[in-house]
């Protein structure tokens, strides 16, 4: 369901060469698909756009050429190759290495007490900023272009959704270290999102690892790689959201064979992640779905029991601060009038949700859990959703409350933007390998590119409907 930043968009290798004018008539339009595995459509782009690799399943026609100055920055931070250091980010550990010795922590740790969002400024995701500057702004003018530039400066999380994305984490932390040495006090924000058989109840964001093909061991190597980076940059506070959708699927979707098969692997992998990343400079939040998913009365206690068990089975790690809600979703924080699509559930916003599940966590042995809530796409209420469970590229949405630790709520550590607005949730093309029917519903904006690809029309929608406004 949830899509992170699955791939680089704007400035990786250009795939399409110049096409004669007579052939342009059959080329894809700007923002259309122009390549990818099993793609049988046009592999060229209309005049004024260039075919750019996005992922193995998708290449996209982007405006202009990939050699602009704004694209150069993106290229320097989105390489698909491993970093040229002694660290290995591709080797798979032997099957027997299911538990590894916890290596020592680096010196100069950015420790904290209490709310980890207090006393630091979350870092604005440079990759997302490069997308906005190179993909969104060139086709905007006037006030919209100025507003888009302001969006690029809002702190948002970077998604580590493949092993190949870990060099981006390293580069980001290096940039933060430089900024902090020059007088800043920044913290890094990342999403750990690479479970084997990921997204078990949907199709749009299937990941790179399979349980049947050594996925658990590969995932542990992915976590080891992240840990090495975090230890190397132990002078920087690092804020992590752990595996969106995974545990929530274990609450409600075990009737789906893929989820039932993945249950033990999910729990083993998440235990490994929160144990290995239990570092003095780290604060972690397990993804906890949202009010319209686990906030229903029948789901609240089973969810709380599962989250508390994960916490206790990992020996109550200090760095596991609590839960993240509404990641990549659309619910308002404290709206007072329930939208029609929430009918039947008294827990119709995220504030009600965290105050419902917080005491239940304590009942099950996790008494000091706190929360963050994603408001990146929650600015317009009600949304255009026809059903509360409609999650893909929903119409009638806008950028929401800006990230801030000034929440006015004892359980909420911070408002955050976890989902970078403008990156697609999933394709509306029913012939695509990762097509999910939710992305072709009447309340999904269409036509939509592959998950993770830039969706200009959606970015414009979010910007137009933003509350507070950027205009």
From Swiss-Prot:
Disulfide bonds join 200-259, 392-439. GO terms for biological process: cellulose catabolic process. Optimum pH is 4-6. It catalyses: Hydrolysis of (1->4)-beta-D-glucosidic linkages in cellulose and cellotetraose, releasing cellobiose from the non-reducing ends of the chains. Residues 107-471 are annotated as: Catalytic. Its EC number is 3.2.1.91. Glycans are attached at residues 111, 121, 130, 133-134, 139, 146, 313, 334. The enzyme consists of two functional domains, a catalytic core joined to a carbohydrate-binding domain (CBM) by a serine-, threonine-, and proline-rich, highly glycosylated linker sequence. This is Exoglucanase 2.
